[in-house]
Amino acid sequence: MALAVLAWRTRTAVIALLSPPQAAALAVRYASKKTGGSSKNLGGKSPGKRFGIRKMEGHYVHAGNILATQRHFRWHPGAHVGLGKNKCLYALEEGVVRYTKEVYVPSPSNSEAVDLVTRLPEGAVLYKTFVHVVPAKPEGTFKLVAML
């Protein structure tokens, strides 16, 4: 009889270990909503700022015409070309637009340009694009005294 009681107790202990408790059967999950995350990439659908060249090579321009708009220096002002406060290039005189690639030697007072030049390899030459306006009328004409 003692053996039967021991077997019955171990069987009920094993069943109690394997079967889930009754309290878990009564637990109910209610509807819930997760909190929304924040979006990081706002403003990606804004239109472009329309930077770029306004007058191409060979175009005739009047004084004050905008030649190019830029955010950073992509084109540098050359002869008869002014630089606006927002880095736009404009014509100072009437004439024809010309673009050239020239060797760029920055002034020693410009620390950013000096840092760039010091990082270049030995013997490297720095070229930049310059915008010029060739005046339509000659600036100064002179005659030799012998021709008078």
UniProtKB/Swiss-Prot annotation:
Transit peptide (first-last residue): 1-30
Name of encoding gene: MRPL27
Pfam families in alphabetical order: Ribosomal_L27
Entry's localization field: Mitochondrion
Any GO BP: translation
Keywords on record: Mitochondrion, Ribonucleoprotein, Ribosomal protein, Transit peptide
Entry-linked SUPFAM superfamilies: Ribosomal L27 protein-like
Top-level taxon: Eukaryota
Subunit (UniProt): Component of the mitochondrial ribosome large subunit (39S) which comprises a 16S rRNA and about 50 distinct proteins.
Family note: Belongs to the bacterial ribosomal protein bL27 family.
Record-given protein name: Large ribosomal subunit protein bL27m
GO MF terms, alphabetically ordered: structural constituent of ribosome
